Amino acid sequence: GFAILGFGAIICQKNQANLYGDSVKLLDFGVITTPAKTPLEQRLCTLYDDLHTVIKQFQPDLVAIEKFFFYRMSNTILVAQARGIILLVLGQHDLPIVEFAPSQIKLTLAGYGKAEKSEVQEAVARELDLDYVPRPDDAADALAIALTAWFQS
């Protein structure tokens, strides 16, 4: 959504000599929040500034995002505006982007494209060797997208 943007940073290493030597490690996860009662332009500025900070902190080689679908929802325009800010910041850092549909993420992590959110979250915890499901949901979703990019590479 627009009020909360989840992020998840992982380190992925492919071992060319050993098919089973690939590894993935959690760096961090969290959310960027923009309070609902704040004027739109300030919310977009917060998103812009905070996303720059996250990118500078983790210096990613690749960014994976969820594909945006237009629903008949009143917040579609707001989400599209936030997405524009996200793409702008990623472009300013010259970062390659991969996008995945929700069904691709579910299929990759849970084994089928209509999996429940809880099944995907449990898969995230398992793949990252965590004894807990990352919270909030937006951060767990971001980690699911990051893992999907890793598995699809």
Spans of features found by a protein language model:
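Phosphate- and other anionic-substrate recognition elements at nucleic-acid/protein interfaces
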Residues: 2-153
